[in-house]
């Protein structure tokens, strides 16, 4: 078995459901120390949600004056869902029809294994490499992400650590390896809106104020609002409701309040403060008595075309013959934190059709090419 596949299987066997790491980072640390990496463990979070983070660095011959290329990834995985719906044990790697099955196979233990082995091969070939290499690994990406990458970034920023390039191993490919990479992500802004009314008997509406009826016109306005037109890199900002709850459960009672959960996925054409102001203005125009709590999940980030995108595109083309597409679609990732200390952040990994699903898998034919692309990026940027 090739080293990349062997390491991937070792990681899959570890039941690292957020925030558990289950020894994944210890495995990585052992291999990285053997290459001369200096490893730092950053543990964060409350006792009932302890998060393990690993920051590992190997300096090149140019020291801190040289370029630093980091790989960012997460060892945690989402829960399995119903075990009886899996074709095999999600934490026991299984090969069927040219695919490797297991939770985390696509998201993102294959990427982590691929970059580790790529670095091993790169260092063996270029022992005097000029630039530096780093790994930023967390066990809190699939969860609340309060004590994962963001904490490492804060620590690095506080001591003036500079990152020049960062490859995030998220599964970005669609139909075949390398057909899409992410050079940015939209921001996420959520709101919990509570519109107040007056509870009463449904047969006496004149003695009550129905908050659902009061909120409906404002919600229609919000649904139809054009928030921005997007730009060259991002689609227009979207506003979507995810939950509406009002009522006591009885069919003859007008509720006293209704609560609506909503979310913006926004581009660099809008700002969180600007979106908040516009929502409040619409609600105020409709004369609502309301409270509104906001949660900023992350601001958008964008890496324009540059050294990293060119190196990654060239490495993908050389290995697969595929001309990659730069995209900012999809959900948020830890790239939003890393972008605060790194000017060039790009995500690249295997196809994502099975992520978070029953029978998650990666096609075995993509495992070695993925590793080779990562090695190609290292060779193009820091050799």
UniProtKB/Swiss-Prot annotation:
Cofactor note: Binds 2 Zn(2+) or Co(2+) ions per subunit.
Gene3D superfamilies with a match to the protein in the record: Zn peptidases (3.40.630.10)
Residues noted as binding Zn(2+) 1 in the record, renumbered to the chain: 74, 107, 170
Key word Metal-binding present: yes
Protein name, UniProt field: Succinyl-diaminopimelate desuccinylase
A GO molecular-function descriptor: succinyl-diaminopimelate desuccinylase activity
InterPro entries attached to this UniProt entry: ArgE/DapE_CS, Bact_exopeptidase_dim_dom, DapE_proteobac, Peptidase_M20, Peptidase_M20_dimer, Peptidase_M20A
EC identifiers of the protein: 3.5.1.18
Subunit structure: Homodimer.
Uppermost EC category: hydrolase
Gene: dapE
Keyword set, alphabetical order: Amino-acid biosynthesis, Cobalt, Diaminopimelate biosynthesis, Hydrolase, Lysine biosynthesis, Metal-binding, Zinc
Cofactor: Zn(2+); Co(2+)
Entry function: Catalyzes the hydrolysis of N-succinyl-L,L-diaminopimelic acid (SDAP), forming succinate and LL-2,6-diaminopimelate (DAP), an intermediate involved in the bacterial biosynthesis of lysine and meso-diaminopimelic acid, an essential component of bacterial cell walls.
Record's keyword annotation contains Electron transport: no
CDD domains named in the record: M20_DapE_proteobac
UniProt family annotation: Belongs to the peptidase M20A family. DapE subfamily.
Active site: 76, 141 (proton acceptor)
